[in-house]
Design a protein with these regions (language model features):
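Short, glycine- and small/hydrophobic-rich beta-strand elements in well-ordered beta-sheets
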Residues: 5, 47-74, 101-116, 192-215, ...
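Short amphipathic alpha-helices in soluble, non-transmembrane regions
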Residues: 90-97, 228-234
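A short acidic (Asp/Glu
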Residues: 76, 89-91, 120
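Secondary-structure boundary elements
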Residues: 84-87, 98-101, 195
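Short, well-ordered beta-strand segments in beta-rich or mixed alpha/beta enzyme
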Residues: 19, 69-84, 170-175, 210-233
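Short S/T/G/P-rich N-terminal loop/turn motif that feeds into the first structured element of a domain
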Residues: 1-52, 83-87, 112-192, 221, ...
Length: 268
C-alpha cells in the first residue's frame, strides 16, 4: 500500500469578490439635488440587476449585494458571486463606469472562491484508488480522483454556487491556519485535521488569490448571533490552537429599493 497523500481534495464553486469603500460625503452633498437623484437612480438600477443575478433556468445565482459598513473601516461593502474571475472583473469595470464611482474610494478588497474541503471523502477515495494498485500523482490516479469528486460536485452544487442569503446583517473576516514553530496546522495528519474540521466550516478559500488563506461570510437577522458563534469557536480546537483571525467587518444590508434612504442618511 503506497503512502497516501495528506492533502485533502477540495471542490471549488463561485468566485467571490468583496469590495470595501469609503464614500465621499462632502463631495456628494455639494451636488445639486437633481444630480444626486439621477446618480442614485442609475446605481439603484445597476444594483437591482446585480441582486437579481442569473434568472436562466438551472443557472448559478451569480448575485451581488450591498451592505452599509458599521464603524471606521469603511462605508460600503459590495459582495459579488460569479462563475469566473473574468466575470468579477467585468463587475468591477461596470461599477467604474457609473456616475457614482467618483464618490467611492476603495480601501480594501478580498478575492476568494467558494471551497468545500473533502476531508472524509478524500481518505476513502485515496484508499480505493490505492486498492486498485494506482500510484499517487500518476495520470491514472488523478483521473480516478477527478471522477470521484465529479459525482460529489454535482450533489453539492447549491452549496458551491450559493444564492446570497436575505439576512439583514453580514459579518465578514479573513483567517489563516497557523504555521508556527510549535503549532503548524499543515503538519498534522489528515485524519486529525478531518476530525477537527467537523467543528466548523470554511466558506471561501483564497490561498494563492489573496493575502489570507480563507474568507468567512456569516449572515444573520440578529447580529448577536455573530458574537455567540465566534465566541463558541474560540473553544473549538481547530480555532483555539490553529486559527489566526484578521479584521472583522460588520455591516447592514442595503437593497436597491432602499438606496435612496442610504444616500439620505435615513436607512432603517
Amino acid at each position: 500500500m503506497p503512502e497516501l497523500p495528506q492533502v485533502p481534495l477540495t471542490l471549488e464553486g463561485s468566485n467571490v469578490l468583496h469590495q470595501i469603500f469609503r464614500f465621499d460625503w462632502t463631495a456628494w452633498k455639494k451636488l445639486p439635488l437633481d444630480e444626486r437623484t439621477a446618480i442614485s437612480a442609475e446605481f439603484s438600477a445597476l444594483l437591482a440587476r446585480w441582486e437579481a443575478g442569473n434568472t436562466e433556468p438551472n443557472g448559478h445565482p451569480n448575485q451581488s449585494a450591498l451592505f452599509s459598513q458599521i464603524g471606521h473601516k469603511g462605508d460600503l461593502i459590495l459582495i459579488h458571486f460569479r462563475d469566473s474571475l473574468e466575470d468579477l472583473n467585468r463587475v468591477e469595470l461596470e461599477l467604474a463606469q457609473t456616475s457614482l464611482y467618483p464618490f467611492l474610494q476603495q480601501t480594501s478588497s478580498y478575492l476568494s472562491v467558494v471551497e468545500l474541503g473533502l476531508y472524509e471523502s478524500s481518505e476513502k477515495i485515496y484508499a480505493q484508488l490505492a486498492e486498485k494498485g494506482l500510484e499517487p500523482g500518476t495520470p491514472e490516479w488523478n483521473a480516478g480522483a477527478g471522477e470521484a469528486t465529479a459525482r460529489t460536485f454535482a450533489s453539492l452544487s447549491s452549496r458551491l454556487f450559493p444564492a446570497i442569503p436575505p439576512a439583514k446583517y453580514l459579518c465578514f473576516y479573513p483567517m489563516d491556519r497557523k504555521r508556527g514553530e510549535q503549532v503548524n496546522w499543515y503538519t498534522e495528519p489528515m485524519a486529525d485535521r478531518r476530525t477537527m474540521m467537523h467543528e466548523r466550516q470554511i466558506i471561501t478559500g483564497s490561498i494563492g488569490l489573496d493575502d489570507w488563506e480563507w474568507g468567512v461570510d456569516l449572515f444573520a437577522d440578529d447580529p448577536i448571533i455573530f458574537k455567540k458563534l465566534i465566541y463558541e469557536m474560540r473553544f473549538d480546537k481547530v480555532s483555539a490552537v490553529y486559527a489566526s483571525f484578521g479584521q472583522f467587518f460588520l455591516s447592514v444590508r442595503v437593497h436597491a429599493a432602499n438606496i435612496n434612504q442610504w444616500f439620505d442618511g435615513t436607512l432603517a
